[in-house]
């Protein structure tokens, strides 16, 4: 896989969402305190490097009292297929895990309030299909799914 883009929001000097393109050869040039090292520190946090620790001092000072700190990475050239278990081989596209550009985009999000960071949440920014009445299927428990199906069962059997 190749890293194509780094996404930063409310991380140190990056208040609004910034998308930093990465190519095969990328150089960061700028004045002192312009945020060059922050990009590398954000990558260390994203990839769980032992030196990449995040704390409340990493929240952008202009972010306000509450919000979310976001570190994301966009990847290309990922494997053609992935093996879930011995009998299940699929692709990221078949699992609807790719963004609108056909790339794998993963974000780590830390909500904060009054200078306190909460536990991270990890999201795939994906172009997932939608249909009326089927919102939030991935977050529903089995009983809720059965209830949803009973409500629409007749519509689909009568076609």
Across the structure, where does each feature detected by a protein language model lie?
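Generic intrinsically disordered, low-complexity segments enriched for polar/acidic and small residues
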Residues: 8-11, 25, 37, 43-44, ...
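Electropositive, glycine-dotted interaction segments
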Residues: 70, 88-159
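Pre-Walker A-like glycine/lysine-rich segment at the N-terminus of P-loop NTPase domains
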Residues: 1-48, 57-66
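Conserved P-loop NTP-binding catalytic core
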Residues: 40-102
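Beta-strand elements of well-folded, non-transmembrane domains
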Residues: 26, 75-79, 110-114
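Beta-strand secondary-structure signal
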Residues: 5-7, 19, 70-74, 105-107
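Short acidic, gly/pro-rich beta-turn/loop elements at beta-sheet edges
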Residues: 16, 30, 81-83, 118
